[in-house]
């Protein structure tokens, strides 16, 4: 059992550590810009770091759910790879947003694509799971033919 989900667990741990890093950056920015809790406004430099952390936190539960569903029902390796791409894009998003609002955009789009790919893999995996075996075999046969032609 553990071997079947080790990649997913590793990506999950990496994601949690990344979230902790983002939180520590907000704490550091609070000190640097003298913004005491519970305030969430201050200099634009602080607000960008704060917003980047909040935005990343808002999407983290969606990411985790899709990572695990895609990994269990589609393919663990494919889901883990998409998860790593997502986390790297989120790190770049955070770093870009800390510099300027404009610099967050390219990594934001990259992380959105990775997340949508995880959603698609999860949906395909669940669809294949619930399809009758004969229909699933026929669809996979058609897909193989299609892939061999290209």
Curated annotation (Swiss-Prot):
Regulation acting on activity, per entry: Inhibited by MK886.
Pathway: Lipid metabolism; leukotriene C4 biosynthesis
Record-linked Pfam families: MAPEG
PTM note: Phosphorylation at Ser-36 by RPS6KB1 inhibits the leukotriene-C4 synthase activity.
Catalytic-site annotation from UniProt: 31, 104
Membrane topology note: Multi-pass membrane protein
Reaction(s) this enzyme catalyzes, per UniProt: leukotriene C4 = leukotriene A4 + glutathione; (13S,14S)-epoxy-(4Z,7Z,9E,11E,16Z,19Z)-docosahexaenoate + glutathione = (13R)-S-glutathionyl-(14S)-hydroxy-(4Z,7Z,9E,11E,16Z,19Z)-docosahexaenoate
Record topological domains on the Cytoplasmic side: 1-6, 70-73, 125-150
GO annotation terms (biological process): leukotriene biosynthetic process; leukotriene metabolic process; long-chain fatty acid biosynthetic process
Sequence positions that bind glutathione: 30, 51-55, 58-59, 93-97
InterPro entries reported for this sequence: 5_LipOase_AP, MAPEG, MAPEG-like_dom_sf, Membr-assoc_MAPEG
Localization of this protein: Nucleus outer membrane; Endoplasmic reticulum membrane; Nucleus membrane
Record's GO cellular component terms: endoplasmic reticulum; endoplasmic reticulum membrane; nuclear envelope; nuclear membrane; nuclear outer membrane
Family note: Belongs to the MAPEG family.
Subunit structure: Homotrimer. Interacts with ALOX5AP and ALOX5.
Protein name listed in UniProt: Leukotriene C4 synthase
Organism of provenance: Bos taurus (Bovine)
């Amino acid at each position: 059992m553990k071997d079947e989900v080790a990649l997913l667990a590793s990506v999950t741990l990496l994601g949690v550590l990344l979230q902790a890093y983002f939180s520590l950056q907000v704490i550091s920015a609070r000190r640097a810009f003298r913004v005491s809790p519970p305030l969430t406004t201050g200099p634009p430099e602080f607000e960008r770091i704060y917003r980047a952390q909040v935005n990343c936190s808002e999407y983290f539960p969606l990411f985790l759910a899709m990572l695990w569903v895609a990994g269990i029902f589609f393919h663990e390796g494919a889901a883990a790879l998409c998860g790593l791409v997502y986390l790297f894009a989120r790190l770049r998003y955070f770093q870009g947003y800390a510099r300027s609002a404009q610099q967050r955009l390219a990594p934001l789009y990259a992380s959105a694509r990775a997340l949508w790919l995880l959603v698609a893999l999860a949906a395909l995996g669940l669809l294949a799971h619930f399809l009758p075996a004969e229909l699933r075999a026929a669809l996979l046969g058609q897909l193989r033919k299609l892939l061999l032609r290209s």
